Each structure stands twice: as structure tokens, then as C-alpha cells.
């Protein structure tokens, strides 16, 4: 039997499918809805303690984000995912728990002042740590016998480091059915990671459709475009602020920035500095470095073999502590600042926006999809004033979107 656990029409819903084979109950993905309200519609409509296995296509929160909630509701089964997905979930689920607790604390201060009921975080750090112990890291392209009647294989989906489509074979009463879960599939030619692999046959295929209504042309060459934006911004004396998801998009931007340096695309500002200001992005970048053999594209592997770090360059700095983060805003020279979260709903990016949105010389460059209702969406749609940390901030900076990168 097969069921879709969530049937809601929202912008980026959490992905979750339910399978039953003989007496085994299985979830494929267990994602959290993304958007401005963390506390709406985030229930798990299955009995968590009855679930035997979870198969995870990739680490993005809309596919993995409710795993700690599943654990807190009693799940103690095994979670199968690729090695890179397991490692990324290790940082992303803990980060998600941290955001939950921070967000709940902030909301509750407001609620207490208004005499309203308090919210409880969906899960805490103990739930995130607990569920991570149930992960079983798997290799690509190997058939794995899960239990009697259930076999799976992870195939590279080319969407994110470690991402996969999952082939599932279910056998009941000598009849075998093959179901393929596409996961999110990359559209090829991404920097760093391999192109999606093909799957030849299946009885049933479930396909993700977040961008299903769009035809993706071949991606443009981003390095020259990015160089032009940096040149224009630095010539004005401003900073280039890039809100970016810590995992995946940040590393892609580092790849393009490295090309700008190595190919001398910005002769006027050859020695420019760039900051990654997100502890999660710094950890994720380290996981990318470890995953060269399994996940990198041939082009990226060649660079590594030549002793070139595909996502590193002179002038790249990382800030992990909040003091280091604050110092960025006291720099006298123009900087490229990559920070999270990508939709500007939380995280250090909000501090950088506070310091740069009012400056006509600065540029805010969006490089990912913006859910309606988020601060990022409002800025892209021409908001003239936004509220940050209780202050009204005028928007005078140049607001740009890098098309086709989503």
C-alpha cells in the first residue's frame, strides 16, 4: 500500500509518503513545511512508534525536518540515507532544533506581554540528537536488503550533495512491485556535484514537482554575471550581501567566486574578501570537502587532483562566533557577505540586512526561491521599508535576483 501523508496546497510542503509491505510500515522522507509560520500544519499524521523504517532522499529540511518530531513521538526504527545525507542531516537537524527553540523563546516573550498562550518548540536538541543515532549511512548504487520483502537502492539525483532517487522493491505473496521515489532531481550541469543518474524501469514513479511547471534552460555562466554585480557594488563603496541556504547554495556561490578569482574576471578588485557568516555553512562546506570521491562531478574532481580547492580561494574568511560576525559590519572596505537563512526569516543574515538595506551603495543578491510571506520575498517584490529587530529600516540598497539559479 502507498499513501501521501501530506495533502496540502502550500508553497514548499514537507514531503512524506507512507508504504506498507507485509507487517512493515515505512516512510519515505519526513519533511517540514517551509515558510513564514513554523507552527502551522506541522503534525505527523501517522503513529510514529509503529513506523519501522524511514528512507530519506536528501537532507533539505522539507524532506528531513520532521524526523526529530517523529522521534519525540516514539519512533525508534532505522533511517536509511546516503552517507553524505546522513552527515548533512547531522548538522541540519541540530540547526533546525536550535531555530525551533530560539523562535519559540522569541514568540513566547511576545505572547507573555500580550497575555496569549505560549508555543512549544516542535522539538528540541535532545530529539535531534536522538534521531541521528538511528541513521544507517548507505552507498550509492548498491541494492540493500532492508528486511524480508523490502529492498532499496539509492541513485544519484544531482540536486544536493548526497541527494538520491530511491528505488524500492516490495515483495508480498511472491509478487514484487518496484516503486521509484524521485526526490528532488537536479537539472544537470551544477557546479561541484554529479548530474542525475537515469533509472530504466519501474511499476510506479512518484515525482517531486516543486519546479514542475518550469522549463529550465541551460544555466547561464554565473561567474561573469556575479563579477559584474561585485564590480558595480564595490565601485559605489558598498557590500554585496547574499542570503543563501547554508547547504548547497552557499557552496555553489563559493565555486563561482573562486572562478572570478582564478580566471581574473574582476581585475579592478583582484584581492576582494568574502565572508561565509553561518556556522552551519562552515560545517557543511567541510562535509563537501570530505565527499569528493562519492559526490563530486568530474570537473570538480579534476580541480582537486590538481591541488585546487573548488570552493576555496585567497580572501575567503569564515566567521563562526557572533563576535566575528559583528566585526564584519565594522570593515572599512567593501565585502562579499554570504549568510543564512536564504529567505531571511532567521539567522545572521538579518543583522547584515539591518546594516546594508538602508545604504544605496550596497546590493542584496538573492540566489534561491523565496516563499511568499517571507522577508526575502517582500524585498524581491519591492518593499520600501521592512522591520528588523524592532526597527523600521528603509530599503535603499539595490535588490537583485540571480535568475535561473533556483
What are these regions (language model features)?
Residues 1-6:
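Short, small-residue-biased leader/transition segments that mark boundaries at the very start
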Residues 11-12, 21-77, 81-135, 185-195, ...:
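Pre-active-site segment of Zn-dependent metallo-hydrolases
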Residues 14-19, 163-168:
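Short beta-strand scaffold segments in enzyme catalytic cores
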Residues 21-25, 143-153, 171-179, 395:
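Beta-strand-turn-beta hairpins that frame and shape the catalytic cleft
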Residues 28-30, 51-60, 64-67, 79-82, ...:
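Active-site neighborhood of phospho(di)ester-bond hydrolases with catalytic His/Asp-centered motifs
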Residues 96-160, 293-332:
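Metallo-beta-lactamase
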Residues 165, 178, 186-277, 363-368, ...:
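Cap/insert and terminal regions of metallo-dependent hydrolase folds
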Residues 229-377, 387:
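Hard-cation-handling environments
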Amino acid at each position: 500500500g502507498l499513501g501521501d501523508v501530506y495533502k496540502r496546497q502550500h508553497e514548499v510542503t514537507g514531503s512524506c509518503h507512507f508504504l506498507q509491505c507485509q507487517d512493515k510500515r515505512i516512510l519515505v522522507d519526513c519533511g517540514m513545511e517551509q515558510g513564514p509560520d513554523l507552527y502551522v500544519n506541522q503534525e505527523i499524521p501517522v503513529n510514529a512508534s509503529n513506523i519501522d523504517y524511514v528512507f530519506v532522499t536528501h537532507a533539505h529540511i522539507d524532506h528531513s525536518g520532521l524526523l526529530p518530531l517523529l522521534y519525540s513521538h516514539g519512533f525508534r526504527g532505522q533511517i536509511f540515507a546516503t552517507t553524505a545525507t546522513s552527515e548533512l542531516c547531522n548538522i541540519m537537524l541540530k540547526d533546525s532544533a536550535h531555530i525551533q527553540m530560539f523562535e519559540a523563546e522569541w514568540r513566547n516573550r511576545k505572547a507573555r506581554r500580550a497575555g496569549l498562550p505560549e508555543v512549544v518548540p516542535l522539538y528540541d536538541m535532545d530529539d535531534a540528537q536522538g534521531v541521528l543515532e538511528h541513521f544507517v549511512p548507505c552507498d550509492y548504487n548498491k541494492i540493500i536488503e532492508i528486511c524480508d520483502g523490502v529492498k532499496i537502492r539509492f541513485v544519484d539525483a544531482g540536486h544536493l550533495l548526497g541527494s538520491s532517487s530511491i528505488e524500492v522493491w516490495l515483495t508480498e505473496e511472491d509478487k514484487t512491485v518496484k516503486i521509484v521515489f524521485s526526490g528532488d532531481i537536479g537539472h544537470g550541469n551544477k557546479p561541484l556535484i554529479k548530474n542525475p543518474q537515469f533509472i530504466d524501469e519501474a511499476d510506479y514513479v512518484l515525482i517531486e514537482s516543486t519546479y514542475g511547471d518550469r522549463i529550465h534552460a541551460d544555466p547561464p555562466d554565473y561567474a561573469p554575471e556575479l563579477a559584474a554585480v561585485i564590480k558595480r557594488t564595490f565601485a559605489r563603496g558598498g557590500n554585496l550581501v547574499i542570503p543563501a541556504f547554508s547547504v548547497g547554495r552557499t557552496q555553489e556561490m563559493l565555486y563561482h567566486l573562486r572562478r572570478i578569482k582564478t580566471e581574473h574576471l574582476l581585475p579592478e578588485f583582484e584581492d576582494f574578501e568574502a565572508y561565509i557568516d553561518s556556522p552551519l555553512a562552515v560545517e557543511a562546506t567541510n562535509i563537501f570537502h570530505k565527499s569528493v570521491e562519492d559526490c563530486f562531478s568530474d570537473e570538480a574532481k579534476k580541480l582537486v587532483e590538481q591541488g585546487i580547492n573548488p570552493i576555496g580561494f585567497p580572501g575567503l574568511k569564515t566567521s563562526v562566533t557572533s563576535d566575528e560576525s559583528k566585526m564584519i559590519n565594522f570593515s572599512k572596505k567593501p565585502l562579499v557577505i554570504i549568510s543564512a537563512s536564504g529567505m531571511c526569516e532567521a539567522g545572521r543574515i538579518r543583522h547584515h540586512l539591518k546594516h546594508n538595506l538602508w545604504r544605496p551603495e550596497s546590493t542584496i543578491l538573492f540566489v534561491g526561491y523565496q516563499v511568499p510571506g517571507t522577508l526575502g520575498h517582500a524585498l524581491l517584490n519591492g518593499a520600501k521599508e521592512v522591520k528588523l529587530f524592532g526597527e523600521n529600516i528603509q530599503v535603499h540598497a539595490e535588490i537583485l535576483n540571480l535568475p535561473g539559479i533556483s
